[in-house]
Swiss-Prot record:
GO terms for biological process: thiocyanate catabolic process. It holds the Pfam family NHase_alpha. Binds 1 Co(3+) ion per subunit. Disulfide bonds: none annotated. This is Thiocyanate hydrolase subunit gamma. The gene is scnC. Belongs to the nitrile hydratase subunit alpha family. SUPFAM superfamilies: Nitrile hydratase alpha chain. Gene3D superfamilies: Nitrile hydratase alpha /Thiocyanate hydrolase gamma.
Length: 243
């Protein structure tokens, strides 16, 4: 699924932070209700849920960052990542079947992982328009803004504008391709290796591959090793659009 739309629309140019998340997702409310019902019906216990929750909160983006760093250094491994993301994940310690406490994954997490390789003329960015599908075993918990209806609705319609709000201004000749995650397929982005990193080790490279880079709303830069504190700001140079 791809989108690359530029339209005309007047925007306020004040530069105050504009938090994207001001809504409670209906799916979060639904999750709590379904979870309580499942425990009541004996499908799993509250202890099972606690163990799973503890496991999920140990996850982070480091395995995905290492996957990208390794691919930057090894063309054959990069090829494997693009062809079979699930198999490539094993090299960074993630087995999508046996890593979760259940030892058989879950319908939510055991699925096809696709690694989307950027190029100088193509930028990928990931969203889940239906709910909040996210490759947790390799990327950890999704950020709150990723789950917000605001991000999910707008990215598909105005990807260039939304990326600009994240501070990522892309030249007009760069195509933006939006990948829509779903129950069966999850995505991570393999950004272009930045200039100024020649001779870097895998560990050094992995440090600059942040979670936001792996979702596609940022690009790696030497010296930048953390996500922006406020993920969404008003763009300094907004991309105008019509409705």
């Amino acid at each position: 699924m791809s989108a690359d739309h530029d339209h005309d629309h007047d925007h306020d140019h004040d530069h105050k932070p504009a938090p994207m998340v001001e809504e409670v997702s209906d799916f979060e409310i639904l999750e709590m209700a379904v979870r309580e019902l499942a425990i009541e019906k004996g499908l799993f216990s509250a202890e099972d849920h606690r163990v799973w929750k503890d496991y999920v909160h140990t996850l982070g983006p480091l395995p995905a960052a290492r996957l990208v760093a390794k691919a930057w250094l090894d063309p054959e491994y990069k090829k494997l990542c693009i062809e079979d993301g699930v198999e490539a994940s094993k090299a960074v310690g993630v087995n999508w079947v046996t890593s979760p406490p259940t030892q058989f994954g879950t319908p939510s997490d055991y699925c096809n992982l696709r690694v989307l390789a950027d190029s100088p003329t193509l930028k990928h960015v990931v969203v889940c328009t239906l709910c909040s599908c996210y490759p947790r075993p390799i990327l950890g918990q999704s950020p709150e803004w990723y789950r917000s209806p605001n991000y999910r609705r707008r990215l598909v319609r105005w990807p260039r504008q939304v990326l600009a709000e994240f501070g990522l201004q892309l030249p007009s000749e760069v195509q933006i391709r939006v990948a829509d995650s779903n129950q069966k397929t999850r995505y991570i982005v393999m950004p272009v290796r930045p200039e100024g990193t020649d001779g870097w080790t895998e560990d050094q490279l992995a440090e600059i591959v942040t979670r936001d880079c792996l979702i596609g709303v940022a690009v790696p830069k030497p010296g930048i090793t953390v996500n922006a504190k406020r993920p969404v700001l008003k763009a300094n140079r907004p991309v105008h659009h019509d409705h």
